[in-house]
Amino acid sequence: MNHKIELFDFQQEVLIDPSRFKVMASGRRVGKSYLAAVAAYQHCLEEPNRRALIIGPTVSMIRESIWLTLKSLVHTEHISGYPREIDLEIRFINGSKITLKGFDRPDALRGISPSPTFIVLDEFAYIKQNAFTEVILPMTSDPQRKAKVFVISTPKGITNDFYK
């Protein structure tokens, strides 16, 4: 742990943009997942009791794409205990936490409490149709939490929700 955070200019620009909903479409290996991990980490450090939820097409994909990166970024003095490998969760001493989930287990995404304050949708073009309106949008409706949403993906044709 304790990896120094280094961002390209375009990543820094996306990170500091104050928009509530952000979408990033780009080719493979440009650093989308790294940026998502940094954004979730910083979000949880900024204020106590925040909840970041990072969702990928499958649990195994999210474990490979973001979990290892996230674990390398966190400073041990910021977290409570150790990253939870089975739950794919990092708890912070300020009460915030980051949880990773997959859309291959959609029922695990319904009724998450407290509602997330930051949601990352990784490789969204590969997530089933209508997932955003059926599962994610209700999570953003809590007026007190006002969840920010960061959608990232490599494009995949024109027949998916990411394209729309």
Task: For every predicted segment, state its role.
Residues 1-164:
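Phosphate/NTP-binding elements of NTP-utilizing enzymes
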